[in-house]
Regions:
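Bacterial N-terminal signal peptides that target proteins for export
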Residues: 1-10
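Beta-strand/loop edge motif enriched in small/polar residues
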Residues: 23-271
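C-terminal motif of bacterial Sec signal peptides marking the signal peptidase cleavage site
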Residues: 18-21
Length: 271
């Protein structure tokens, strides 16, 4: 996936050439059938298949600490086994309130059980003491400044959607920094992918996806109007508000490169 500055509201997971053209309910990236960090070169055809690989990954006993003050805590959600070994699921909180990095630790998966918000929604433009904003994000309240949270993800980290309704929302005034490498891509995928239930014919729709909510101009308003330069829009299908739009076409929601997004595109709601 090419390095891009990501503007407005982008849903990552369609195609690397159409990042801005994806809707929140139509993203899909089938990917592989099992979680493999280092993708091997295509082998020459052989008359007989090789033996099934021996699982090499073992789950650690505990989840890592992300912050010294305990402000962002992971929940130990048990283990899961698949063709590549056993993993411990370290579940992200529903609201990430402080900048953190998810480190790569052998046998650790970072889980999303439902919607995970990166920071609080800061509104159409950055709030201030003179112009506070009542954030639409659950658990945030009134803001007098952007929360400025950055979720950083180390190369080789695997994140999973534990349910169909699981998705990552990077709210206005916050960022994601997910920069993998060619040999250690960052993988967002479904729990079934890790468990080895998926096949070559498995389609997307097993979890929601990754949504970047920005302050670029939009024209399909359901809040405000284009004429008054107050146009905003709600993310389709979100149970609770996930709003995007503003008046800053230079807005930067972070950086993503060498990222795989597999089996995403679950329909969050029928409307």
């Amino acid at each position: 996936l090419a390095v891009k500055n990501l503007h407005r509201s982008l849903v990552i997971g369609c195609s690397a050439l159409a990042l801005a053209g994806c809707g929140a309910d139509d993203i899909a990236s089938p990917g592989g059938t099992g979680v493999v960090i280092n993708q091997p070169a295509t082998p020459a055809p052989t008359p007989t298949p090789g033996p099934t690989p021996t699982p090499t990954v073992s789950a650690p006993d505990i989840c890592p600490n992300l912050t010294n003050d305990g402000s962002v805590q992971l929940t130990n959600a048990g283990t899961i086994s698949g063709p590549t070994g056993s993993y411990r699921i370290c579940q992200l909180p529903s609201l990430i309130t402080k900048s953190v990095e998810l480190p790569r630790i052998a046998g650790v998966l970072y889980g999303m059980n439902g919607r995970v918000d990166v920071g609080c929604d800061g509104g159409f433009s950055a709030p201030s003491a003179g112009s506070p904003y009542n954030s639409t994000t659950i658990g945030c309240g009134t803001l007098t400044a952007d929360t400025g949270v950055t979720l950083s993800i180390a190369p080789g980290v695997i994140l999973i959607g534990q349910t169909g309704q699981s998705w990552l929302a990077v709210n206005r005034g916050n960022k994601i920094n997910a920069v993998g490498t060619a040999d250690k891509p960052i993988i967002f995928t479904s729990q079934d992918n890790v468990a080895g239930f998926n096949t070559e014919s498995t389609q997307g729709g097993q979890w929601g996806g990754v949504v970047l909510l920005g302050r670029g101009k939009v024209t399909d308003c359901n809040v405000g109007t284009v004429a008054s330069n107050t146009c905003e829009r709600d993310t389709e299908g979100a149970v609770n508000l996930a709003r995007f739009g503003g008046n800053d076409d230079t807005y930067n929601a972070g950086r993503m490169s060498y990222v795989q997004i597999r089996y995403s595109g679950f329909v969050l709601s029928n409307n």
